[in-house]
Amino acid sequence: MENISPALLEWFYKNRRSLPFREDPTPYHVWLSEVMLQQTRVSAVLPYYYRFLEALPDIPALAACEEEKLHKLWEGLGYYSRVRNLQKAAKLVCAQYGGQLPADYAALLALPGIGEYTAGAIASISFGLPVPAVDGNVLRVFSRLYNDPGVITEPAVKKAFTARVMEHQPPEKAGDYNQALMELGALVCVPNGAPLCGQCPLAEVCRARAAGTTAQLPQKAKPKPRKIVPVTLALVESPAGFLVQQRPQKGLLAGLWQPVLWEDEHLLQAEVLARLAALGLDTGTAAPAALPAAKHIFTHIEWLMSGVQLHVAAQSAPAGYVWANREQLRTTYTLPGAFRAYKPLLL
């Protein structure tokens, strides 16, 4: 196949979106944007990107940020391990590299939370290094370009596609080339069997288009079935606010805050009241109201939530819990998106 970079770059320079991390592609800006864009659309990321940089304009500021503030800045983006790894890496960068990301692919790859794609994006876009940056968009483009039925989630297939990506990369324009492939996958060679081939600068050399197989590519492994987990919540409100607790520092939703809940259990109202009493909470004669059922899907787990809402008299919080008023829940305590259905009641 002839080299695709001339046609690809010509298209990119005419059609690329104007994005803040492209207009000012410092290593920190590119790093932050790539981490935020994992699992999240550009349109959803931009308000968070601006807000995060306003609060934490450089790597030393990120490294020094308090955990609650960091979580609050990320609230709504989900996948909070991303921001925890951002801070871990920032602390290492301050300790080892004077607060500046190293212009070295291997050194970037050694930082917490930075995988091959993110390291490649920073190294090529910010430092101009001729390295690959292969994400799902790029894999989809090359799967169709070469009409390759390989399962793109398999390491050997990804390695082969990465080699093909590098065959076409102009070393002096590595960053633009990598961004052009990502942009093509995001705007034209889109997923779910609906590529806009009439707008593609590579249509004439695309083997899947010639074979009529674009709708079948790329091939992905069958997803594993999610584990269904029943969850019972109790939104307990007193004059001091709602009763909340911090989740453990490891595991699902680590370090975030939640209402009173019991995982792996679907409890009746009487059982909820008994559990609250066992915590040492005086529920008095309060008549609980049923919460609407809701669900939240994590990568491999699906929560099926139900529960109650009740008001109680002023009293001390049970051990391990705090009372948080609405203002504190808005500004201080980070409630994850898993409780989105109930946030109107809490905020």
Task: Walk through the language-model features, giving the residues of each.
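Catalytic cores of DNA base-excision repair glycosylases
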Residues: 5-198, 202-211, 215, 228, ...
